[in-house]
Amino acid sequence: IRTHTLPCKCTICPKAFSRPWLLQGHIRTHTGEKPFSCTYCNRAFA
């Protein structure tokens, strides 16, 4: 039984999230965006 709503819906796939920041992180899986980089090894991460 779900006790919360999922108002933030992905426009690319059927997934939905309860928080906007969760959706924002999920969208990166579709776009390939990696905005965070390690200052030690320079690898980029989502």
UniProtKB/Swiss-Prot annotation:
Species in which this protein is naturally found: Tribolium castaneum (Red flour beetle)
Protein name, UniProt field: Escargot/snail protein homolog
InterPro entries for this protein: Snail/Krueppel_Znf (IPR050527), Znf_C2H2_sf (IPR036236), Znf_C2H2_type (IPR013087)
Zinc finger map (C2H2-type): 1-4, 8-30, 37-46
Localization: Nucleus
PANTHER family from the UniProt entry: PROTEIN ESCARGOT (PTHR24388:SF54), ZINC FINGER PROTEIN (PTHR24388)
Keywords: DNA-binding, Metal-binding, Nucleus, Repeat, Zinc, Zinc-finger
Cited Pfam families: zf-C2H2 (PF00096)
Recorded GO MF terms: DNA binding; zinc ion binding
Listed GO CC annotations: nucleus
Coarse class of the protein's main subcellular location: nucleus
Lineage of producing organism: Eukaryota, Metazoa, Ecdysozoa, Arthropoda, Hexapoda
UniProt family annotation: Belongs to the snail C2H2-type zinc-finger protein family.
Highest taxon above the source species: Eukaryota
The keyword Transcription is assigned to this record: no
